């Protein structure tokens, strides 16, 4: 079951209309401080469920237990940005605030982008990595690689290793190069993991 999400769209810069979408958890469940409940003589059971829902509870002994006294502060809402074709990563600066993951195209390395010129309106790995680093986004997933970058190094003059090397030169967070059918999970701890393949 998916949590409630807030979705926002940001127009990107490309030859045709392209958009980025940010997905932010709208409601983050607060955790009960069970040690404090036990220490206060509140036995586990239906009362805990009511407190978890933010409702005060009248105990059989006549005490009123206030939910706010036993709920830990909520964790930070998780936020993911998924962008389409875009030659200006900085258009996402407003959305990148507090983002946990940025998924963005990195079609070329800087060298190939300079050789091709601005016409195709795509980003280089360095452009995206510099942006993600400046925005303090802890997880970056690069996508939409030009076919000139072969999947296996040594089979041609360019490989995905070139994209990865360029990105790592500008970005110190968790970096992934997405492959077709990859699935990622963002844990409640903010750690991005490659999910078990289908």
PLM ranges: what are they?
Residues 88-198:
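Binuclear metal-ion centers of metallo-dependent hydrolases, dominated by the metallo-beta-lactamase
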């Amino acid at each position: 079951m998916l949590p409630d999400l807030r979705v926002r769209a940001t127009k990107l810069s490309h030859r045709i209309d392209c958009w980025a979408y940010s997905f932010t958890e709208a409601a983050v469940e607060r955790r009960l401080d069970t040690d404090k409940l036990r220490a206060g003589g509140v036995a586990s059971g239906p009362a805990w469920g009511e407190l978890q829902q933010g409702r005060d509870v009248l105990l059989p002994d006549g005490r009123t237990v206030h939910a706010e006294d036993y709920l830990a502060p909520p964790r930070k809402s998780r936020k993911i940005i998924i962008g389409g074709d875009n030659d200006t990563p900085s258009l996402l600066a407003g959305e990148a605030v507090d983002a946990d993951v940025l998924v963005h195209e990195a079609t070329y390395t800087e060298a190939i982008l300079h050789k091709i010129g601005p016409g195709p309106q795509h980003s280089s790995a360095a452009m995206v990595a510099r942006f993600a680093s400046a925005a303090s986004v802890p997880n970056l997933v690069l996508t939409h690689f030009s076919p000139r970058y072969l999947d296996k190094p040594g089979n041609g003059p360019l490989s995905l290793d070139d994209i990865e090397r360029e990105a790592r030169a500008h970005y110190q967070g968790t970096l992934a190069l997405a492959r077709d059918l990859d699935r990622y999970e963002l844990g409640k701890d903010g750690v991005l993991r490659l999910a078990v393949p289908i």
